[in-house]
Structures are given as C-alpha cells and as structure tokens.
Amino acid sequence: MIINIVEILIFLVCVLFSVAYLTVAERKTLAYMQRRLGPNFVGYYGLLQAFADAVKLLLKEIVLPKESNYIILVISPLITLITALIGWVVIPLGPGITLGELNLGILFSLAIGSLGVFGSLLSGWSSNSKYSLLGSIRSTAQLISYELILTSIFIIIIMFVSSLNITTIIETQRVVWYCIPLLPLLLIFFIASVAETARPPFDLTESESELVAGYFTEYSGSPFVFFFLAEYSNIILISAFNGYLLLGGYLSFNYSYLFNILFNDYSYVSFLFEGLINSSAYAIKLVFLMFSFIWVRAAFPRFTYDNLINFCWIILLPLLFGIFLIIPSTLYIFDSFPTLI
C-alpha cells in the first residue's frame, strides 16, 4: 500500500514537472519562431520561469464573483485537473511499467477523458458571467464532437489488435508501427487531439477577441493554476496516446540484430540496453508530438467556430466512417482478422 502511494506521488511529480517545462519549451519555441528572446532571466536560459509564474499565480488573491455559485466555481477546476491526472493510470512507460494494468485500458481512458467536460461546463455555468457561459457551451460542443473522432480511431485500431489493453496494442507493433498502414489516422488523430485540448488554432473556447478568456474568465489565483495544469497535462497525455496507438509507444524499430552482434545471450547488459533504447524512443516520440502542438499554434490562424464544428461532422467523421468500412473489408479479403475476434 505504501509502495503504491509512493509510486503515485513520484508519477504525479514527474507529470507536473513535465507540464512546467512544457510551458517553458512552448514559450521559448514560439519566441524563436517569432524572432524574439522569450523568457531568459529567471534561472539559466529562463529554465525556472515556470516556477516563478506558478508562485506568482498561487500568491494572487482568489476573487469570486458576487452572484456566482462559490462551491461549484471552486470545485470545477479540481474536476478538470483530477480527470487529466487520472488518465495517466493506464499509460505504460515500458513493458509492465504502469500504475494500473487494465484489460479495458482504452475504455477507461475514454471514460475518464469524457468526464473533463463537466469541469468546463460547471465552471462557465457557476461563474454567472455570459462570457464564461458561452465559453463553456463552446467547449462542451467541441469536446463532444472531437471525442467521437478519437473514439472512432480507437475502434479502428482495436480491429487490428482485438484487445483494449494498451500494453497489448503496443506489443503488437513490434513488427510494424500502425502509423505505416494507417497513415491517414495519424494526421486525423493529431487534428482531433489539438481540438480536444482546445489548443490553437482550435481555441475557440477562450478566443480573446470574443469571450475574453472563455469559461475561466472569472478565475484567478490557484483555481486558474488548476485549469492551466490540466490543459498542459492533457497535451502530454493525448500525445502519449497518439504515440502508443500509432507510433509503437516505447518500441523503436526492430533492433534485435544489434543484440546478436553485441551480446551472445540475453544478459542483464542487453536488458539494460533494450531499456535505454525503449525509453529514448518513447521520449523522442513524445517530444516530437508535443512540439507539433507548439508548431501548429505558431503557424496557423484561428478557425471560426462554425468551420471547426463543420470540419468535424462534415469532413473528418465521414472520412473515418469510410476508413471504418475499408479496413474490415481488407482484413476479410486477406483473411487477416485477429484470432480473438
């Protein structure tokens, strides 16, 4: 029991540190793309800027609107943050290295991810602000729409694997990553990920020119920090899912021939060598996917809300349904259905 609690605390600290340095990386990358310096005073090369910002926000006064529902207004950011952190339970960092090895890991992640919408919806309603309410309505419609896209992609991948266990999905990609036969899904998954996390150019829930700051307009101090942590935690989490489902997760390309050259048998040295390669492959994929979020923010203008919703229901969803029909037909023709189906 004590060991499990320690593991959870270590995992949470690692996630929160990753969130902190993702914000620094985003600001430095955007500054480089826009030919300016960015944060460079707090710590070496600005590496401690995230902690300075966190202290500043935590020390600010929590101001609540007079006519708001105080209890729900304070609880809503916690709902968003907790659902973002619980999603990490089923994420494997390596073979057998996970907080909770669930046979229904995909279903669990979808269920927990869909609960995050309640935080934004309740925060907008309880703020007693028209800007916040409109932002929460936009957020709800956007998250529900693109949640359907992500669910469809999960179902297509489950057709290949015949399992809802994330580790099993990763291990079936030892021969070839699914992004190679399912290349269009990689692009669709990334687009849906950007929309699901409400990141630019799909940040219509908090468009400054229309809604001030969306559903967290009335937040300040620590409740605002919770929304901030939840947003960037979701970016890392959904990037991890993208890497696990389509990019082989912690697997690199087939390197078994290196073992035959370097080691005569499967010794502890070869085991450590494999762990080093797997962890490096996982880190490279995750950094690449998170950098893609930052690059899209700098490169593309914001969509209008009607274009965002129409893009989901008129373009992406019919395209996925077409893929949904093609893949089972192809598997049936070549008699390649998974044996468990």
Curated annotation (Swiss-Prot):
Catalytic activity: a ubiquinone + NADH + 5 H(+)(in) = a ubiquinol + NAD(+) + 4 H(+)(out)
Subcellular location: Mitochondrion inner membrane
Transmembrane segments: 2-22, 39-59, 71-91, 104-124, 141-161, 175-195, 212-230, 243-263, 276-296, 308-328
One Gene Ontology term from the biological process aspect of the record: aerobic respiration
Main subcellular localisation: mitochondrion
Description of how the protein assembles with itself and partners: Complex I is composed of 37 different subunits.
Protein name: NADH-ubiquinone oxidoreductase chain 1
Gene that produces this protein: ND1
